[in-house]
């Protein structure tokens, strides 16, 4: 079976030199760049020989005929889905395998009929798909169609001026500056054109450009307050609140203050004052800064740094206990390492054996009175040596428990990684996980005293008002609350 011909003749009709799949028994899977090459040779129309441009070696391929033929085979709905899949693949949002799977679903014939004609139809779709991808790839390596009169419909999925569904545009004969700008804008991708439209709308309606790059640049530039109201200017002069030139100098003095990372020390009072005055001027505050504000900021900085050091110490202690040894409760109810508890038990056992040995020695001493003096001297020496050894072990243990541990930069880094709310402006978000709060439904105690309400229903009051204000007693209020909180 020969290839499906184009439904309507076009001024520039492309030729497909590749043989049909039926004649060559060749099948190409969608998404594979293995199809025959598409020729860029075009036959000019006899009626427009004068206006047709000569086809050079870098001439772009007219994809309009292939697109129309593929649209007629797929249908409008399938073509829309196919164009979306190809666009996602070209943008890199679909892999080659995903493209093949999606196109298999689009090109698959209906489940009701699986005849030979449907197989040939599928082969024709695969052939046109491969030729279309090769044509798009070939056009991407050739000159831009903008500026020419004949092939403006060869790019995009039928968005050119030669598409019969689109309104024909008038061609201006004179090459004006506006037309040049228009062609440059139209050559940009769709996302960039939409960004230009948004900038134009925001600049015209709101009077300000809400562009992220522009806003970032404005945030980095120091802001100097300017007085535009005459009354405010009089008040500034009368109160001797300086001039815009002096305000700009205050801002520059704030920027010139050395940072703590440069001086390797906490800022002093003068540095705090200059920095606070500069920030106040940038935000339009032209008054004076009280010295007590500087003291408050200094205390806040000290407390902030102390909190970081405190969290770091707790983290180091926790990691040392967690990864060094297992801990358990001792006889006194205090947490102690398992190795130390085993050592204590071993020492106690050794002490018990020593006591038993001493008792046996005392019994032998009673039997031999003559040798008692010598043995007593030896015992005194042994006792004194054992007491000295135990005292030394106690001192070493005390020094081991009270030894000084230095914090390193790695410890600070680990602490800030575990508690990012210490340095990031998201403390309320990260600190919620450390508060231990529970939901309201988890706060209800199902084993409370209110469960004994059915046992005392006979003592329930009648809720009769004592006066016209309908105010009951405290006892009635308690029963009312119990009735509200319990189910009937």
Curated annotation (Swiss-Prot):
GO terms for molecular function: transcription coactivator activity; transcription coregulator activity. It is found in: Nucleus. GO terms for cellular component: nucleus; SAGA complex; SLIK (SAGA-like) complex. InterPro entries: Hfi1/Tada1 (IPR024738). Keywords: Nucleus, Transcription, Transcription regulation. The keyword Transcription applies. Residues 37-58 have a biased composition (Polar residues). The keyword Transcription applies. GO terms for biological process: chromatin organization; regulation of transcription by RNA polymerase II; transcription by RNA polymerase II. It comes from the Eukaryota. Residues 1-58, 352-383 are annotated as: Disordered. Component of the transcription coactivator SAGA complex. SAGA acts as a general cofactor required for essentially all RNA polymerase II transcription. At the promoters, SAGA is required for transcription pre-initiation complex (PIC) recruitment. It influences RNA polymerase II transcriptional activity through different activities such as TBP interaction (via core/TAF module) and promoter selectivity, interaction with transcription activators (via Tra1/SPT module), and chromatin modification through histone acetylation (via HAT module) and deubiquitination (via DUB module). Component of the 1.8 MDa SAGA (Spt-Ada-Gcn5 acetyltransferase) complex, which is composed of 19 subunits TRA1, SPT7, TAF5, NGG1/ADA3, SGF73, SPT20/ADA5, SPT8, TAF12, TAF6, HFI1/ADA1, UBP8, GCN5, ADA2, SPT3, SGF29, TAF10, TAF9, SGF11 and SUS1. Present with 7950 molecules/cell in log phase SD medium. This is SAGA complex subunit HFI1. It comes from Saccharomyces cerevisiae (strain ATCC 204508 / S288c) (Baker's yeast).
